[in-house]
């Protein structure tokens, strides 16, 4: 089954061109199926690009999914037309009474700021507490993963001396966990971050398990034993050219970024990257939707408040 998105959302034409089955809301309304309700709290500056990346990952399951795009505040994003935000996004306050089967909280380019200096940190804390009562399973990406661990368990990130950027090999640490079902023992994923929380810090929290990690990146996929919280410290959603765009953006800005590791063939930016992460990225989200969301969510979402 497809993801359900608004008929006029620009992401629809991009996904259709990639042969991804997308159903607009008009057609979906004719089917007598209770779709999964999934929210995407999009914290990235380029909302439209991020929408496509996560919608692509949500599309590869037999489940019908109704997607709400959510903004955390009314501040106009720098790289997205306000007309797009008004047409396709809901303010968090407007969905605060709703329950969701799943919620994705994206990353944000805020690694160099203390949490208390993030302009929407107080609202972010409200969202994190709200999700405990309104969402069956929440997946936090990159910055959001660190922010959630800090809020819930007081584990603060440290800043690396140099940005971690590139494609890195990871090892599955718990092959029996359903989130890792079908994964190769070693698989690749993109990272682009300054912040890091040690494997030991994750493992020190009762009820959390590190499911995949590497010596270079540290913990990559971490999940709570009750399947309600998933922390992904990298970017499995990234497009083939995402790291290339970041690298060239920083060069243009007069910075001296390190070249993304294991990304360009022969470390030559003139060559397109060899994509080695998309299959496992898709599998991660398929497993999350199936085993952590669909097989655990109540039919009556209103009962989620009893799980908090």
Curated annotation (Swiss-Prot):
InterPro entries hit by this protein: Class_I_gatase-like, HST_MetA, MetA_family
Main location class: cytoplasm
Pathway field: Amino-acid biosynthesis; L-methionine biosynthesis via de novo pathway; O-succinyl-L-homoserine from L-homoserine: step 1/1
Xref: Pfam families: HTS (PF04204)
Keyword S-adenosyl-L-methionine among UniProt keywords: no
EC number(s) stated in the UniProt entry for this protein: 2.3.1.46
Xref: Gene3D superfamilies: 3.40.50.880
Site feature location: Important for acyl-CoA specificity: 111
Site positions (Important for substrate specificity): 192
Chain positions recorded as substrate binding sites: 163, 192, 249
One annotated GO biological process: L-methionine biosynthetic process from homoserine via O-succinyl-L-homoserine and cystathionine
Catalytic residues (positions): 142, 235, 237
Catalyzed reactions per annotation: L-homoserine + succinyl-CoA = O-succinyl-L-homoserine + CoA
Biological source species: Pseudoalteromonas atlantica (strain T6c / ATCC BAA-1087)
Main enzyme class: transferase
Locations listed in the record: Cytoplasm
Tagged with keyword Amino-acid biosynthesis: yes
GO MF annotations in UniProt: homoserine O-acetyltransferase activity; homoserine O-succinyltransferase activity
Protein name (database record): Homoserine O-succinyltransferase
Family note: Belongs to the MetA family.
Stretches of the chain forming a coiled coil according to its record: none
Protein encoded by which gene: metAS
Entry keyword set: Acyltransferase, Amino-acid biosynthesis, Cytoplasm, Methionine biosynthesis, Transferase
Function: Transfers a succinyl group from succinyl-CoA to L-homoserine, forming succinyl-L-homoserine.
HAMAP family: MetA_acyltransf
One GO location term (cellular component): cytoplasm
